[in-house]
């Protein structure tokens, strides 16, 4: 699905972020809301050879994997007017060209019981992507994250900021995949930090 197909005839658009977009959207938006989408789980299964790694040592970043009866929490950003075209151009380079993500339309459910869902655009990497890494053990993922760095910074920052977002913005939500990788990473780097 092309983003242009989603925005045709619309005056506003919601964009759902579940990885670095939750703390670093880097585009103008009217407002943002914390909430979730259904039918997807967040996994550190996608490679990153630009933002958080390189060709020799790709970092690990999140993508969404379809699964019934689960949800993924994040932030949806509403863009309006000229912000729609500007944000889609920017995100096309950031997520699609450099990250290999595809776009899909999903229902976003804002936190709170009395708010109806809104349609949102989300970027998802699939196993067809050449830099898709797929499943690995918690320890393998943490070890890879510990040593990778790209143009946007260290892969460690990506993981820790995402975990911090979940603790601060979604304190009642458990994300075992995310938090187990964070714990494994901290166990790996703690001796290095203490020795410094």
From Swiss-Prot:
Regions that span the bilayer: none
Alphabetized InterPro entries for the sequence: ChaC, GGCT-like, GGCT-like_sf
Entry's Gene Ontology molecular function annotations: glutathione specific gamma-glutamylcyclotransferase activity; Notch binding
Cited Pfam families: ChaC
Keyword Lyase found: yes
Disulfide bonds: none
Keywords from the named record: Apoptosis, Cytoplasm, Golgi apparatus, Lyase, Neurogenesis, Notch signaling pathway, Unfolded protein response
Residues at which substrate binds: 15-20
Subcellular location: Cytoplasm, Cytosol; Golgi apparatus, trans-Golgi network
GO BP term, example: response to unfolded protein
Catalytic residues (UniProt): 95 (proton acceptor)
Catalytic activity: glutathione = L-cysteinylglycine + 5-oxo-L-proline
PANTHER family from the UniProt entry: CATION TRANSPORT PROTEIN CHAC-RELATED, GLUTATHIONE-SPECIFIC GAMMA-GLUTAMYLCYCLOTRANSFERASE 1
Family: Belongs to the gamma-glutamylcyclotransferase family. ChaC subfamily.
Name the UniProt record assigns to this protein: Glutathione-specific gamma-glutamylcyclotransferase 1
Source organism phylogeny: Eukaryota, Metazoa, Chordata, Craniata, Vertebrata
Chain's gene name: chac1
